[in-house]
Amino acid sequence: VAAPTAPPNATTPAPAPSTPAPPQRSPFTLPNVPPPHARSAQPGDGEWKPVPEVGETEGQPLALLTTLHPHPIRKDVEVVVIAFDLTRSELLWVAGAKEPESKTASPEKRKGMVPARDHDRLLAAFNGGFMAKHGRYGAMLDGAEFVPPREGACTVGITKPGGVRVAPWEEIAAAKAELAAWRQTPPCLLHDGQPHQSVRHD
């Protein structure tokens, strides 16, 4: 069934240009995590809840938080986990003013501050990473290599389009030209769904 066409001599207004609707993104939800130990578990453990301080967009929270008690007995030992929706936000790395120590990276690459252009959209900031002398774990930002990469080291790679990949260096090295930044740590605690062989788990 179609609408009738206009007579040949009729004046038909040009249709307004249509703007395609933006693709619908999935709601940001995560499956609850079973508490590791019933004896030390507390109410709400493993249940993901929005983080109000981070805010929301498109009616969806930008971050979710849960708490777990990993000790079999002690209830005062807790781990707080925050997950960000990377389809609605992005991860940026800013080099410290002194770390990672490097003799090759330009001082212009290491101001140790969040750039002013990012202040209005900043959701959260955290400080982390090993000092260069503690393992010589690699780091690179915008083409400037502060410390060369180490084989076997867990690498957080930020792609030029803004994606994030976490994997051992040997799985990322082939695509390093596509990365805007990367930072390394000791071996990944979890990779491909499996804990590292040195991690104790019950």
Regions found by a protein language model. Give the residues of each.
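Zymogen propeptides
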Residues: 1-147
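A short, sequence-level motif marking secondary-structure junctions
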Residues: 96-99, 170-174, 202
